[in-house]
Regions:
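Acidic, surface-exposed loops and disordered segments
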Residues: 1-150
Length: 150
């Protein structure tokens, strides 16, 4: 199946079957895929948390925007979190990225206001979400993008 066909078949799941579970092998594959997600300058300013424990899912569902039923029914919840500590992020890129990427950040992003840098970091997380949703579609795993868990 080519990517266009995959995109045409992808859908947002409205209701999950609570008896269907994603396998550990599929979870490990998804984790590897997320590690390979694209981001500007390969910054990867994110954390991904896979939640299968029903009690934890219920706690997160209770503070989500209108998605409580979906979260509680789904096999797993994957929380995409942005690194919001700019100093930590800058230390991370200094240690892990090539000099060209570091120079780009220092020249174009670092001089920006803190709110602009945080917005840029958040946009990187959305790139990984799109990548993840495409991976789920390719693996025939139902998915629903959601916002609202702080």
């Amino acid at each position: 199946m080519n990517f266009l066909e995959l995109a045409q078949q992808r859908y947002t799941t409205k209701k999950y079957n609570p008896t269907q579970k994603i396998t550990n092998e599929e979870i490990e594959t998804l984790k590897q895929i997320l590690q390979l997600s694209p981001s500007s300058i390969n910054s990867q300013p994110w954390h991904f948390t896979f939640v299968a424990d029903q009690e934890q899912k219920s706690k997160l569902a209770a503070v989500s925007y209108f998605n409580e039923e979906r979260i509680n029914q789904a096999s797993h919840l994957v929380v995409f979190s942005v690194i919001d500590d700019i100093a930590l992020f800058e230390k991370q890129i200094e240690q892990n990225l090539p000099q060209g990427a570091i120079n780009y950040y220092k020249q174009f992003m670092q001089p920006q206001a803190e709110e602009n840098i945080k917005s840029w970091l958040q946009h990187q997380v959305y790139l990984s979400l799109g990548f993840f949703l495409s991976a789920c579609a390719a693996m025939h795993i139902d998915s629903t993008p959601m916002e609202g868990i702080e």
